[in-house]
Amino acid sequence: MGPTDQDWIGCAVSIACDEVLGVFQGLIKQISAEEITIVRAFRNGVPLRKQNAEVVLKCTDIRSIDLIEPAKQDLDGHTAPPPVVNKPTPVKLPHFSNILGKQQQLQLQQQQQQLQLQQQQKQQFQEQEREQDLPSTPRSRANDNGRVAAGGASSSSGPRGNFNSALSDKMHQLKLIETNGSNGTLRTPQTSRASSAQQQPQISTTPNSVAAFFGNMIPPKVEVKLGSYVSNTRESYCSSSGDSGEATGLSLGSSKPIDIVSNGDGFYKQTAASSYGNTNGNVRRNGNANNNGNGTGNGSYTNGNGNGNGKNKRNRVRRESSMRQQQVQLTFGSEADDPLIHEDFDFEGNLALFDKQAIWDDIESTTQKPDVVRHIVNNHHHKPEQKYRHDENILASKPLQLRQIESMFGGSQDFVTDDGLIIPTIPAYVRNKIEISADKAGLSLQRQIDILARGASDLAITLLGGARRLTPANNHQWPKIAIICDGGKNMRTINIGAATGRQLASHGLTVLLYVEQAKLLEQNSSSPEISLFKATDNVIVHSVDALPTPDLVILSTNTANLSDAIRKWLSVNRASVLAIDPPPCGINEVAIKYSILPILPLNGISTATTSSSSSAAATPTPIASTSAAASATKSAASTNNCGKLYLCNLGIPDKFYRDCGIKYKSPYGHKYVIPIHSKD
């Protein structure tokens, strides 16, 4: 009885196809009259990416099939020297993105050389067999005749009854695997292929599929099926618990060539090419091997039962290897025929998007102009985008009532705040009437003076630099302030000046109070404000010569004409002048820079020149240098005005405004002192 299809399963074959497919080598898994299925395949000497992949070749594409002979024994039972077997040379896996081109040409040349060498070796081997007159076997007869049919039937001659028995005897004679009881490893005594493969393992990063490995090299005629040897028992050619190290090595993509040795079932198994070892790359498999393949031992990295530490380590190594492969695939996984590589960059289209003429016009329009003009031009062309404030309502609301204060008296002049609210002026007698009405209701004149002095002191501290200058680290050069109370015929202006000096002294500033009318102080020695000012240990002087060089001068007077000595001293002095409730017409020959007013401004009040912007008047500028103050004094010496105006909130209720004929709503918001500007 001749050999059946099942007798060829497990045999190592070399299948030569047409020029397009090339030469395949592997183990026969399934064979029929129409097709043959091999596993652990090599194509043109290059191993497949996955060792558990199945390659199905149709008989119409196969030109010849050659059996790859294992090691054999002579008639005396001694192992003969192994013949030269045309096994695939270990080839380092190529970089798959560059697998086409010159590399393919080199592979084709290598394939042709291998085919020629294979034919020469086969002829030599056949001549040796004829000389020794060995009994023929199915494999030798197949080689003598030179070919095996594509359908799996043999074309050899001879008795078919002895063919199967001879094949079985030959398979049993080739069982050369010995079990080493001391360490549980598998060895082949007379071949050096397994040991050399263990000494030089080649482990490379592999793609996700066979198609990704070969790319365009596998034609569509070859069906590549990725078998799952874990779920399908029929496809598990590397089974049994004792072979867990081999399965692990195969799953990691070992590129070791096929070792052709047989077992009792007719399968050819590859010895472990790679296993988990120490950091220097040596292969370590310790333990005792038994018949069922289970291994035990101390310090074993891969054993049959799956030691807890070894199993966790293997799982961790698999996860890390999988993550590295995914990262490499994401980084370098672009195909060689990626259309983006061959797409040309449109330089002309990209250049057309750049408006060079507009850039040149902008450069030429500003390069030849002075810095001031260039700054104005840039601000004109590049206007900042108007944005909403964090507290501004973006929804439409009722129109803002800018005129919240309405006066029924004639001669009124309108001022505006920074928020655009209109502040009208009122006659002097109306303001006096409001003060008297509040005094009668309990808000005494002394309390009103104290609130006005508080607003004046806050404004003075801001003008002196505020937190930038009044710090403990700058205590050695704190400013000095001179308060001038001149020309007053009553104690009101003196009390305002004394209260302002007291509150400034409470901040640690040095204050000198100048009062020309010494007799007036003697007559009103019981004035509470004078007594409180003396308690601050500051000095009241009556001579201009006793005045130091101050950083700020505060005028508290209601007359437009000062004494000659004070005017001369002010003209020589370079300090800025802050006036508290000055006359509406200003002070003759005195350049007032700032003025603070109670309640509402009076009719006919004169402000600073129109050249000064409203934005600059909105925030008081600290006194930076005496030279700047001197230049400002000279420019404004010929004008009689009150400078920049500030309005102080005295806390008078709205009822007293209405009683005096003024429709009033507070314009102060969150401040006690607000700047006002001329509406014109």
UniProtKB/Swiss-Prot annotation:
Residue ranges, annotated region (Disordered): 73-95, 120-166, 181-205, 277-325
Gene Ontology annotations for the cellular component aspect, listed alphabetically: P-body
Domain Sm residues, every copy: 1-71
Record flagged with keyword Transport: no
GO terms, biological process: deadenylation-independent decapping of nuclear-transcribed mRNA; mRNA catabolic process; P-body assembly
Documented effect of changing residue 25 to A: Strongly reduced interaction with DCP1A. No effect on P-body targeting
Example of a GO MF term: mRNA binding
Compositional bias annotation for Low complexity: 277-304
Annotated spans, Required for interaction with Me31B: 331-440
Region annotated Required for interaction with DCP2, chain positions: 102-338
Subcellular locations according to the entry: Cytoplasm, P-body
Residue positions, PTM Phosphoserine: 136
Modified residues (Phosphothreonine): 188
Keywords: Cytoplasm, Phosphoprotein
The DFDF domain, residue ranges: 333-369
Domain YjeF N-terminal: 430-658
Pfam families the UniProt entry points to: FDF, LSM14
Chain intervals for the UniProt region annotation (Required for P-body targeting and interaction with DCP1A): 1-101
Impact upon substituting residue 347 to A: Minor effect on interaction with DDX6
Statement: the UniProt record of this protein carries the keyword Magnesium: no
Function: In the process of mRNA degradation, may play a role in mRNA decapping.
PANTHER family hit by this protein: ENHANCER OF MRNA-DECAPPING PROTEIN 3
Quaternary structure (record): Forms a complex with DCP1A, DCP2, Me31B/DDX6 and EDC4/HEDLS. Within this complex directly interacts with DCP1A, DCP2 and Me31B/DDX6. Homooligomer. Interacts with Gyf.
Protein family per UniProt: Belongs to the EDC3 family.
Protein name as catalogued: Enhancer of mRNA-decapping protein 3
Source organism of the structure: Drosophila melanogaster (Fruit fly)
